[in-house]
Regions:
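Short acidic/polar alpha-helix capping motifs at helix-coil junctions
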Residues: 1, 17, 43-49, 65-70, ...
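Short hydrophobic segments within beta-strands
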Residues: 7-9, 95, 163
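C-terminal cap/substrate-recognition subdomain and adjoining C-terminal extension
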Residues: 77-91, 98-216
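Hydrophobic/aromatic residues in well-formed alpha-helices
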Residues: 35, 49, 64, 204-207
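Metal-dependent phosphoesterase signature
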Residues: 47-83, 88-90
Length: 216
C-alpha cells in the first residue's frame, strides 16, 4: 500500500461532546435511550438505531446549532492535525453517524470543508423528526457504513488510519491498519477486550506524532 488516509469519527472525537446525544437529550423524547440500549445489546443494527433515534428529534437545524454553539469545542490540536494532513497530502474524511449538518457547521466555521470530506447520513427535518439517507454500501457484507468505508479504501490500495470513540466505530477500527481511540472510551474498552492493538489518546498531537511515518 502506497498511500494512507485518515478516517475519523466526529462526536466525542473531533469535538468535546457527543453533539448528536446532546440534541437527543434536549430535543427528543427520552425514550431514545431505549433504542440506544437495543443497539448496545446487539438487537438492532447501528444504522437502524440512529434512524429511529433521530426520528424523535423535534427541533429544526438552526435551533440545534444555536444550542450546540454554546457547548461544543474542538479536541486540542485538531487544528494542527488538519494542517499536518494538508501539508502532507494526507486525505482526511469525517465518517460519522452524527447529524451531518452539525458536522458541516463546525468544520465550515474554520474553513475546513475544502480540505475535509464528510461521510455521514444526510438528515432532513420533517414533521416526524429527522429522516436519514445513509451512504450506499460498497460491499453489502459490511457491518456498518463506517466499516464499509474502511474496506473501500483498503481495496483500492490505501492504508487506513481510524480514529474514534464509540461502539459503532469498533467494526471500522478493527478492520483499519492503524487505530486510535479516545482514552477511556467504549471503543478503547472494546479494542482491549478484543485484544486489538489500539493507541489511546486524549488529543490529536498524539495522532500527529504517530502518523508521521504514514504520510505520502
Amino acid at each position: 500500500m502506497n498511500r494512507s488516509v485518515i478516517l475519523s469519527d466526529f462526536d466525542n472525537t473531533i469535538v468535546n461532546i457527543d453533539a448528536a446525544a446532546f440534541a437527543l437529550d434536549h430535543f427528543a423524547d427520552p425514550s431514545w435511550k431505549r433504542i440506544e440500549a437495543l443497539f448496545k445489546a446487539g438487537k438492532i443494527t447501528f444504522e437502524d438505531s440512529i434512524r429511529e433515534e433521530y426520528a424523535m428529534i423535534n427541533a429544526p437545524e438552526n435551533v440545534i446549532l444555536d444550542a450546540l454553539d454554546r457547548v461544543v469545542s474542538l479536541r486540542p490540536h485538531f487544528d494542527e492535525l488538519v494542517e499536518h494532513c494538508r501539508k502532507n497530502n494526507l486525505p482526511f474524511t469525517v465518517v460519522s453517524a452524527g447529524l451531518e449538518f452539525t458536522i458541516r457547521h463546525f468544520l465550515n466555521q474554520k474553513g475546513w470543508l475544502k480540505f475535509i470530506e464528510i461521510y455521514a447520513p444526510k438528515a432532513e427535518y420533517t414533521s416526524h423528526g429527522y429522516r436519514l439517507r445513509f451512504p450506499k454500501f460498497f460491499d453489502e457484507s459490511s457491518i456498518n457504513f463506517k466499516h464499509d468505508l474502511v474496506k473501500y479504501h483498503q481495496k483500492r490500495g490505501s492504508r487506513v488510519i481510524f480514529i474514534g470513540d464509540g461502539l459503532g466505530d469498533f467494526p471500522a477500527a478493527r478492520e483499519a491498519d492503524l487505530r486510535f481511540a479516545i482514552k477511556g472510551s467504549n471503543l478503547a474498552v472494546a479494542c482491549l477486550k478484543g485484544n486489538i492493538a489500539c493507541s489511546e489518546v486524549i488529543d490529536f498531537q498524539e495522532v500527529i506524532d504517530e502518523t508521521r511515518n504514514y504520510v505520502g
